[in-house]
């Protein structure tokens, strides 16, 4: 005598089938971007050159995705973005840039007390092709930063503590 599947098993099978159908439909959606570039812009409140626990993320900072042809250096694509309340920007891109070098670059800070561009933190490279072994469309970019005009009072003690922690590791 054949056994009747338990209701939980049947429900799980139906849910699994629906998930597969919906994911296939979403994968074929021509309106979805090929790539989603995401990163953050911060204010280096200690002028340390890196993110600390007193770093502030900047809402309303302007960034630009620039893709330049590898051989000629000609600008092939530029897309502007703006950070949200958490200092996070999201830029959607519809096509691949296999022959390009793409970087997100700082454009402007809305904070007058934190608008000095940090060398080496003013741009972040992103790979925008599928031919590099990355199948996910989300492409995270390294954080971009500006220096605060005057370090916060807590910074001297914080940087001393960080230096002391480094000495303990040796």
UniProtKB/Swiss-Prot annotation:
GO terms for cellular component: extracellular space. InterPro entries: Allergen_Ole_e_I_CS (IPR006040), Pollen_Ole_e1_allergen (IPR006041). Keywords: Disulfide bond, Glycoprotein, Signal. Residues 1-27 form the signal peptide. Disulfide bonds join 43-114, 46-155, 67-102. It comes from the Eukaryota. Glycans are attached at residue 53. Pollen. The keyword Disulfide bond applies. Belongs to the Ole e I family. This is Pollen-specific protein C13. It comes from Zea mays (Maize).
